[in-house]
Amino acid sequence: MGARKRLRAEKLKSEKNLTALASLNSSPIAPRKMRLVADLVRGVEVNKALNILQHNSKFASKSLEKLLRSAIANWEQKNEGKSIEDEKLVVSSIQVDSAAMMKRIQTAPQGRAHRVRKRSNHVTIIIDGAK
């Protein structure tokens, strides 16, 4: 491996250590409802985001809080000996994607039936040091 390629690889590896990722798959909450809560904490410092999620009354905030705690634990595992407060971690991105839908039938008048789509979502959260 050449010198430039090695330096580039080392730089990418050090940048990768500064970020942490956590994902939640097939959460049984509609993506639209989850996005309402995700928009509150996107781009916010980690401690402030945890505070926002703890005091939010929406059901989706509980699962997002758990996911954020998991991302923090992943970051601590990568960066042993470093403190969250010193690094000023920020929720750099949250992606809420729709997952598989469960299709159910609800009875309707005159012998008909309507389809009910129970939606679920995938959430990916990335935390990063403030720049």
Features from the language model and the residues they span:
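Structured, basic alpha/beta domains of bacterial-type, RNA-associated proteins
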Residues: G2-N25, L36, L40, E45-K131
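Conserved residues at beta->alpha junctions
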Residues: P28
